[in-house]
Amino acid sequence: MLILGSGSARRKELLESASIDFLLVPSDYNESQVAFEGDTLKYVETIAENKAKALLHKYPLDVILTADTVVEVDGEILGKPKDIEDAQKMLQLLNDKTHHVYTGVCIVSKDKKEVFVESASVTFNKLSTLDIESYIQTKEPMDKAGAYAIQGIGAKLIKQYDGDFHTIMGLPLKLVLEKLKDFNIVPKLK
């Protein structure tokens, strides 16, 4: 059985859209235990892997899938905003700039482990203070890395993106499905 170790509604929706059977069990791993030391890829890999390790001992016979997504702009890492003020700061940082989104993924069983990172770049439109405030009022940015959802209302903030759309959403679905085959997890036929 596949265990999705995530509280992310987006990751859940993506796996469901691929007709994968899974059990949703958010990992209780505290991400703040990992300090950012300048290497974004290593950072998201480590968090994804630690989330998986926290679940593997509870589900030793299953396959665990975990992920972590961050936004990097001007050398700064942006996770989920802590509050409205934090969301405003993040959106202002992203305003009229190109940034990078990194999603680290860990798929692990008792016999095997795959850890990888996918990235994409996103360019924001030039936003007014009112644009930012209006978007924050929707509440959409509050549980998203970088304080926006490319697949939601936040699409209006985006000028362009380069890379995999699902990576920006938080789970590089095509690559995850390929890797899951190695763990004998395949989509069910409808």
From Swiss-Prot:
GO term, biological process aspect, one: nucleotide metabolic process
InterPro entries according to UniProt: ITPase-like_fam, Maf-like
Catalytic activity line of the entry: dTTP + H2O = dTMP + diphosphate + H(+); UTP + H2O = UMP + diphosphate + H(+)
Compartments where located: Cytoplasm
Family: Belongs to the Maf family. YhdE subfamily.
Domain of life of the source: Bacteria
Origin species: Acholeplasma laidlawii (strain PG-8A)
The protein's name in its UniProt record: dTTP/UTP pyrophosphatase
Primary site of residence: cytoplasm
Cellular component annotations (GO), alphabetically ordered: cytoplasm
GO molecular function: dTTP diphosphatase activity; UTP diphosphatase activity
Record's keyword annotation contains Nucleotide-binding: no
Pfam families the UniProt entry points to: Maf
Keyword entries, A-Z: Cytoplasm, Hydrolase, Nucleotide metabolism
Keyword Hydrolase: yes
Known cofactor(s): a divalent metal cation
